Amino acid sequence: MIYFGRSIDNHYTTMMTKTLEIDLRSAEGLKLNRRPIKKKTFAVVKIDEKCRKSNLDESRRSNPTWNYKSEMPINGNEQFIFIEVFYRTGSGHDKKIGEAKIPTNDFMGRYSPEGHLNFLSYRLRDEFGDKCGIVNLSILVKSDPTRDYGACSSQAAVTGLWRPRLETASIDGYGGRTVTGVPVWGLYQRQF
């Protein structure tokens, strides 16, 4: 397939897959028809065709807490993930309160490095586009330990001579403490 003069194949898109650790923390000010919700609520994360459902908050408040962690794969071509919040009726049916549309470049962009924990809050909107609350979550883009070692010998990786380092280095002379160095070469330079 040709797209803007470049060929895109399946191998390219599978290399862009990352793993997200999503923590659905809570919601604030949930409203239905401009009235605070006093029902059991839960949230759903949707990425492409995949979805994960949080536990049900039994408190029956308009500020529910879920603290639900989940890991989900995301293709590098995805532009948005969706968070939907539902309430459960007395008869056991689930009704949608609202949804938040989260751009992936908010946590996978060039200013947000891999391995950085992002705490995010987004406005929930109902089916008419009206504000119906805020959802709070955290997203961590898991880093691939083998990604940075692409420049090392591919032969070493194939033969099993290379393994990613799992422990942190310890320095015997400093008792494991962090040492900070400040360059001072500019202070003592001679003027010629």
UniProtKB/Swiss-Prot annotation:
Tissues expressing this chain: Expressed in roots, leaves, stems and flowers.
Note: Overexpression of BAP1 can suppress a defect in BON1 and confers more susceptibility to virulent pathogens.
Keyword Membrane: yes
UniProt membrane topology term: Peripheral membrane protein
Disruption phenotype: Dwarf, twisted leaves and enhanced disease resistance to bacterial and oomycete pathogens in cv. Columbia when grown under constant loght at 22 degrees Celsius. No visible phenotype when grown at 28 degrees Celsius. Accelerated hypersensitive response (HR). Bap1 and bap2 double mutant is seedling lethal.
Organism: Arabidopsis thaliana (Mouse-ear cress)
Upregulating conditions: Down-regulated by high temperature. Up-regulated by salicylic acid, AgNO(3), chitin, cycloheximide, ozone, syringolin, salt stress and upon pathogen or nematode infection.
A Pfam family recorded for this sequence: C2
Residue intervals of the C2 domain: 1-119
Record's function text: Negative regulator of cell death and defense responses. Exhibits calcium-dependent phospholipid binding properties.
Main location: membrane
Gene: BAP1
Subunit annotation: Interacts with BON1 (via VWA domain), BON2 and BON3.
GO biological process, one term: response to salicylic acid
CC per GO annotation: membrane
InterPro entries documented for this protein: C2_dom, C2_domain_sf, C2_SRC2/BAP
Example of a GO MF term: phospholipid binding
Disulfide bond positions: none
Protein name per the record: BON1-associated protein 1
Location in or out of the cell: Membrane
Keywords of this entry: Membrane, Plant defense
